C-alpha cells in the first residue's frame, strides 16, 4: 500500500492528503474511507474534521449572516442557489437553537425571484422565543428595522401535508393582530428570493396582541393601520394578505410540505404584511391597530 502524500498550506494551515485514507474512531474502527481528504480545521464543515465542501457554500455564509446580525453591520448579498439558500437558513437557525433559543413558529414573506424574473415567491423564516419584543426593543440592535402589520395564527393541530381553505379551522383555533419587525442583514441592498431565504426571510423580532377565537369570516371587511407615535403611516385591508389571510396558511402548508417541514402544534404563524414596511427609529412608539382583531404596540428605545 502506498503511503498518502501530505501537502501543508503554509498560509491557511490546511492539510491535504493524496490517496485513500481510512478515518477511524478512538478504538481503531473505520468510520469512513475517503479519497484525497483535506483537513482544514476551519470548523465550518458539517460535523466532520475534514472538509466536505459545506464550509464554503453553507456554514461560512451562515456564520457571516449571524455575525452581521450580532455586529449590526450590513453585508453584500451573495446569491446562493435555491437548495444552498435553504441549507444556509437551516444552519443559521440551528446556531440560534444551539444557544438555547426555541423555535416558536414561522413568518411568511415574499421576494422577487430575480432581476430577470419578477415573479413573486413565497418564502418563510423561523421565529424563536428570543425574537419576542412585546416589552419593547432597542432600534440600535438592528441594521435597518421595519415594522409591518400582520395577522398571527396559532396552530392547534399540526400540519404535515397540504391543506385546503376548508380545512384551516381544523388546524388553527386562534388568531391575533401582529407586528413583525424584519431586518435583512443586507441593509437596504436590493435582494431576491435566494438571498432572502438564506437570511431566514429577514426574521428579526415580533409582537402580537390578545388571542381571539378563529372563524372563517373573522377577517372579513377588516382594515389595519400601522401607526408611529399615534400618526397613521400605512392603512390597508386585510384582504391585501393574499386576497384572504387564510390563504397564507393554505399556501404555507404547500410550501412547508415540499420542504419536509411540519407546522407544529402551538406554533405561531405570521401571515405576511398587509402594509408596506415602516422604518423604525429610537424614541418612537409603533402600533398595529386592526379593529375587530386587536391592537399591538411596541416601544423603540
Give the ranges of each region predicted by the language model.
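Structural motif
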Residues: 25-26, 228-229, 290
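Short, charged beta-turn/beta-strand-edge "cap" motif at the junction between a beta-strand
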Residues: 46, 274-278, 292-295
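Catalytic-core "active-site belt" of small-molecule-metabolizing enzymes
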Residues: 64-243, 285, 293-301
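Iron-sulfur (Fe-S) cluster-binding segments and ferredoxin-like electron-carrier domains
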Residues: 49-61
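N-terminal pre-ligand scaffold of iron-sulfur
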Residues: 1-44, 48
Amino acid at each position: 500500500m502506498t503511503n498518502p502524500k501530505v501537502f501543508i498550506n503554509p498560509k491557511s494551515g490546511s492539510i491535504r492528503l493524496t490517496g485513500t485514507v481510512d478515518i477511524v474512531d478512538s478504538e481503531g474502527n473505520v468510520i469512513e474511507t475517503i479519497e484525497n481528504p483535506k483537513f482544514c480545521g476551519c470548523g465550518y464543515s458539517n460535523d466532520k474534521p475534514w472538509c466536505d465542501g459545506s464550509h464554503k457554500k453553507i456554514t461560512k455564509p451562515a456564520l457571516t449572516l449571524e455575525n452581521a446580525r450580532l455586529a449590526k453591520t450590513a453585508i453584500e448579498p451573495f446569491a446562493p442557489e435555491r437548495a444552498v439558500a435553504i441549507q444556509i437558513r437551516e444552519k443559521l437557525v440551528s446556531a440560534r437553537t444551539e444557544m438555547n433559543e426555541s423555535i416558536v413558529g414561522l413568518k411568511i414573506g415574499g421576494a422577487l425571484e430575480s432581476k430577470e424574473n419578477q415573479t413573486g415567491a413565497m418564502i418563510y423564516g423561523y421565529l424563536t422565543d428570543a425574537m419576542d419584543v412585546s416589552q419593547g426593543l432597542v432600534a440600535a440592535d438592528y441594521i435597518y428595522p421595519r415594522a409591518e402589520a400582520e395577522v398571527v395564527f396559532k396552530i392547534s393541530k399540526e400540519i404535515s401535508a397540504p391543506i385546503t381553505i376548508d380545512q384551516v379551522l381544523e388546524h388553527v383555533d386562534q388568531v391575533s393582530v401582529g407586528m413583525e419587525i424584519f431586518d435583512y442583514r443586507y441593509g437596504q441592498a436590493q435582494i431576491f428570493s435566494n438571498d432572502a431565504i438564506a437570511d431566514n426571510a429577514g426574521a428579526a423580532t415580533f409582537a402580537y396582541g390578545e388571542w381571539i377565537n378563529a372563524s372563517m369570516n373573522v377577517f372579513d371587511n377588516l382594515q389595519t393601520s400601522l401607526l408611529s407615535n399615534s400618526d397613521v403611516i400605512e392603512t390597508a385591508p386585510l384582504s391585501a394578505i393574499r386576497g384572504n389571510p387564510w390563504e397564507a396558511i393554505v399556501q404555507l402548508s404547500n410550501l412547508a410540505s415540499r420542504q419536509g417541514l411540519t407546522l407544529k402544534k402551538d406554533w405561531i404563524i405570521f401571515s405576511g404584511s398587509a402594509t408596506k414596511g415602516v422604518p423604525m427609529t429610537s424614541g418612537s412608539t409603533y402600533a398595529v391597530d386592526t379593529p375587530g382583531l386587536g391592537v399591538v404596540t411596541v416601544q423603540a428605545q
